[in-house]
A protein has these predicted regions:
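Catalytic machinery of carbohydrate-active enzymes
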Residues: 1-309
Length: 309
């Protein structure tokens, strides 16, 4: 059974699609999975044992046409995207059966469940959404020699989801006697990582490593999977940590924790302030005070860490 799956664009969404993808695989006899999507999404899923081919989609329509024709014939096609470009690609692809995710159809539940409901609707099944399932690189033997806390201060969604570097530094200073510190971040998030690094140096904290902007997706997965503790905002790396059930403190401000919190991680705790203006779902605070993150203090996060231990 030849199956083509178009993955979501973003890192976190791609991790959250894995329970639905596993249900697709379990439904069909001898599935051969080809995945298409953004570079980030492909890097997350390419190590899955059922994936036989992976193709990065380019943005221009000529490339879409060429890729669709070069991929050949499939028995079934599932798209986990609902964009106009994805709808065009659906028309171009050769498949006996084609299904497209409808973002507005599935509401008031976790994103993992939205993707899973979509697959149940397509297949006329009643699968439950299982655990997140991403695989470390087969070539990796990475391990930390000492207990390590990872912090992930950045966010691709916008500045409204970001907590403050001085607060992260205060948390790291308190935890530095128990843990070595690793600062994570993607391209464009190096600024906040450098601010945290400067604060740590000023506090005399030297047992840290700043990896912001320096890791591939595979390296990020391998390194997060081996952490002893993770402190993060609502982000893609947060979902990687959930996949490996890393003890996690997740800070939520403008986004909906009931939809995008860690899935099935019993070692996770959410820190948020439950303000009337939450969740606004804005990239920048429309009220100009950013209290949803500004009112979270280092003491709140340290208390959450203690509750995990």
């Amino acid at each position: 059974m030849k199956i083509l799956i178009e993955l979501p664009t973003w890192l976190g969404d791609t991790v959250m699609v894995t329970p639905a993808m596993d249900n697709i695989i379990s439904h069909y006899n001898k599935p051969e999975i080809t995945i298409i999507g953004s570079f980030v999404s492909i890097e997350v899923i390419k190590n899955h044992p059922k994936v036989v081919k992976a193709e990065v989609l380019k943005k221009n329509y000529i490339s879409l046409y060429k890729i669709a024709k070069n991929l050949g014939q499939f028995d079934v096609y599932f798209s986990f995207r609902s964009s106009f470009r994805s709808r065009i690609f659906k028309l171009l692809i050769s498949s006996k059966n084609k299904y497209q995710f409808e973002r507005n159809k599935y509401q008031n539940c976790h994103q993992v469940e939205k993707y899973n409901h979509y697959i149940n609707d397509c297949l006329k099944t009643d699968f439950k959404a299982g655990k997140l399932n991403i695989k470390p690189s087969l070539n990796s033997s990475f391990n930390y020699s000492d207990p390590v806390v990872g912090i992930n201060p950045g966010s691709s969604y916008g500045e409204a989801k970001r907590w403050y570097p001085e607060e992260y530094a205060e948390v790291c200073a308190k935890l530095s006697l128990q843990y070595n510190i690793v600062i994570f971040g993607g391209p464009g998030e190096e600024d906040i990582a450098v601010d945290i690094e400067k604060s740590l140096i000023e506090k005399g904290i030297l047992n840290y490593q700043n990896l912001s902007g320096k890791t591939s997706i595979s390296e990020l997965v391998n390194q997060i999977s081996n952490l002893d503790l993770f402190i993060t905002g609502d982000s893609g790396p947060m979902h990687i940590a959930a996949s490996f059930q890393v003890p996690t403190v997740a800070l939520f401000g403008p986004t909906r924790d009931d939809e995008t919190s860690q899935w099935m991680n019993p070692k996770s705790i959410i820190v948020k302030k439950n303000l009337d203006c939450q969740p606004c779902m804005k990239r920048a605070c429309p009220l100009k005070h950013h209290d949803c993150m500004n009112l979270i203090k280092a003491a709140d996060v340290l208390k959450a860490v203690q509750s995990l231990n």
